[in-house]
Amino acid sequence: MTVALVLHRADGAPLSTSFRRAAFGKNDPFARNREIAWEGPDSMIAGRVSLVGEHRIASFPHIETIVVVEGELTLETAGQAPLVLGPGAGAVVGCGTALRMSAESRTRFVFCAAACKRPTKTGLAPLRADADFKPTATLPADVLLGPAPECRSDNAFTEDDVEYKAGTWDSTPYHRIVRPHRMNEFMHLLAGGVRFAAPDGSVLSMGAGDALFVPQGAPIGWESSERVAKFYVVQSVHASTGRD
């Protein structure tokens, strides 16, 4: 079973992740440029896109969280100030959004997208490192190998139809056992470092500027020795809808 898929390394180190060029649905605006690392039965994908130039989309066909890792990307929609995203900046594009997207030079972003048949949220939701953090639940004692952390989050976007949430999260250091991941999760680390443990004892070390995706059910542990902050996308998957 896949434990974690590395989508980007800030230091430019080569990736072992396999990407395939493919569109996400018949109306994908990035069909020629999309590289998919993971696609689940729950209509969620994660990967990367490289592009240059201008793209005008009358109605964005899905939900997509974008975090720029190289270059600069400008997102514009009616009724909102333009968002200019440089490396480490991100935003969520709601399904159905009329969007103008432009990049004057080659730009790359990592993404986590999901299909949505009954969208309720359109527009752009910026992701912010200096988020309005609020305390959130810590981890249960039976999965911790040490003191319980203090966790905070700021949820910037929610689409209830597909249980898709995106925002910013941070935590004090903690050590957690290897266990099945409770949801699909995209992470772009903003600060700190994490050692993700696999059942075979191997460890994947990730730091600020790195991005990865962990599928629901993948067995994985967490160990951090400093404050960690990240942009996240999470999605719960249910067997009743063919998602598990």
Tell where the protein language model's regions lie, with residue ranges.
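Ordered, small/hydrophobic-rich secondary-structure cores
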Residues: 1-91
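Short acidic-glycine-tyrosine-enriched beta hairpin
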Residues: 79-96, 200-217
